[in-house]
Amino acid sequence: MSDNDTIVAQATPPGRGGVGILRISGLKAREVAETVLGKLPKPRYADYLPFKDADGSVLDQGIALWFPGPNSFTGEDVLELQGHGGPVILDLLLKRILTIPDLRIARPGEFSERAFLNDKLDLAQAEAIADLIDASSEQAARSALNSLQGAFSARVNHLVEALTHLRIYVEAAIDFPDEEIDFLSDGKIEAQLNDVIADLDAVRAEARQGSLLREGMKVVIAGRPNAGKSSLLNALAGREAAIVTDIAGTTRDVLREHIHIDGMPLHIIDTAGLREASDEVERIGIERAWQEIEQADRVLFMVDGTTTDAVDPAEIWPEFIARLPAKLPITVVRNKADITGETLGMSEVNGHALIRLSARTGEGVDVLRNHLKQSMGFDTNMEGGFLARRRHLQALEQAAEHLQQGKAQLLGAWAGELLAEELRLAQQNLSEITGEFTSDDLLGRIFSSFCIGK
C-alpha cells in the first residue's frame, strides 16, 4: 500500500438510497474516467453519462464530476460518480474500477488526509469535517462549520505569529549581546508577552466551550435507594427512560440518556442506589455506579427530603462525600419538595449548589437545567465559536504553562536561553493544533476515526 496509489471509496452511507456516490482521487482518476465513462468530463461541470463495464454493457447511468488537481478537495485529480444508491449497483461499479491497476480502496479518512498533506486544509480544519458529520445539535454543527472555514486555525495562527515576533527579539539579544538590545528598559517585551498570554487565555476559554459542545458533559445522578434518581433522569430526559417504583433497588445497572439543554449536549447517567448490596447483581451495579462517578464531570447528589432536614452533604452522608474524587463538582438535589413543602429553587451550602425540586411533578427541574448549563460556562449566544477536541485543550494548556514559565524568566533572573526555549515550546504546542508540527502517529490516530469516503 502506497500513499501515491489512486484511491476509491463510497462517499455515501452504506445501504439503499436514492443516490450513491463513488469518489476517486489520484493519478489514475483520469484513466478511470476514460475507462468507465468513455471520455473525460468537462472540469467542474455535471455530465450525465452511462457507467460501463469492461464488455461495454451499461452498469448504471448518472452524473460524473471531474476536478483536475490541484483545484480539488484533495489537491489531486478527483472523479466523482453519482449513480443510483443500490448496494449491488455500487458494488459492481466499484469492482469495475478496481480492475484498473494501482487502484485500491481508501483507508478511513484518507481523502481528508491527502487534502491535509497537499495543504488544502490544516489539521484543525480536517478534524472539523468529522466533527461536522458527527454534530449532535444545531450549535455544534455551526461551530464545526466555523472550524472548517478556519475560525479556530486563524486564532491559533495569530498566536503563533505573535510568538514568532517575540522569539526574534529574544534570540537577537542572545546572539548579539554586544549590541546592547535592552528588553526591560521600556517594558515592551513584557507587554507583548502579556498580550499573547491574554489572547491565549481567551482562545482557551472558547476552546473549552467548543470541547463541551463536541464531547458533552457527563453528569452522574447518585445517592441512596429510593431518593428519586430515576425519576430525575426521566424528568431531564422528558420521557420514561427508567422504571420507577417504590421498591428500593429497582435500578440495578447504569442507565444513560443523551439530552440537549439549549444546544449543550449532556450525558445523564442514572446509577444503582448506593448501600450495602443484598445480592451479587446489586453489588455489581453499585461497583459500576462508582466507576461512573469517578469519571463524571459533575455529580448530582440526590437526597430524599422526607428522610432528613440536613442540607450539607458532609452531614447527610460523610462516607459518600469522603469517597468522591477530589475537586469533583457536586450539586446537592433535595427531592420530594412536593411532599416536604420546601421552597423550590437554588441556594448554596458549604461551597456546593443546593437545589430543591420535585422530580415526580417536574417542579424546580428547570432550575437544575439552568444550573447545569451555567456550571460549565456555556454561552448560547456565542457567535463565531468553534469546536475543539481534547488534544487541542491539552496543547493550549501546555502552551500557557510554557508562557508563564517564560514570563518568570523575563521578570526574574533574565535567563535569555531559557526564555527563548519556553517561547519555542509554546509555539510548538500551538503548531500541533494546525498540524505544522505533528507526529505521524498522531495523524494516523486522527484520520483513522473518519468515514471511509472522507
Swiss-Prot record:
Domain TrmE-type G per the UniProt entry, residue ranges:
216-377
Q: What class of enzyme is it?
A: hydrolase
Function as written in the Swiss-Prot or TrEMBL entry:
Exhibits a very high intrinsic GTPase hydrolysis rate. Involved in the addition of a carboxymethylaminomethyl (cmnm) group at the wobble position (U34) of certain tRNAs, forming tRNA-cmnm(5)s(2)U34.
InterPro entries for the chain: G_TrmE, GTP-bd, GTP-bd_TrmE_N, GTPase_MnmE, MnmE_dom2, MnmE_helical, P-loop_NTPase, Small_GTP-bd
Organism field = Escherichia coli O17:K52:H18 (strain UMN026 / ExPEC)
User: Which cofactors are reported in the record for this sequence?
Assistant: K(+)
Q: Which GO terms describe its cellular component?
A: cytosol
Q: What is this protein called?
A: tRNA modification GTPase MnmE
Q: What is the lineage of its organism?
A: Bacteria, Pseudomonadati, Pseudomonadota, Gammaproteobacteria, Enterobacterales
Explain how, and how many, cofactor molecules are bound: Binds 1 potassium ion per subunit.
Q: What is its EC number?
A: 3.6.-.-
**Primary subcellular site in the record, as a coarse category:** cytoplasm
| Keywords in alphabetical order | Cytoplasm, GTP-binding, Hydrolase, Magnesium, Metal-binding, Nucleotide-binding, Potassium, tRNA processing
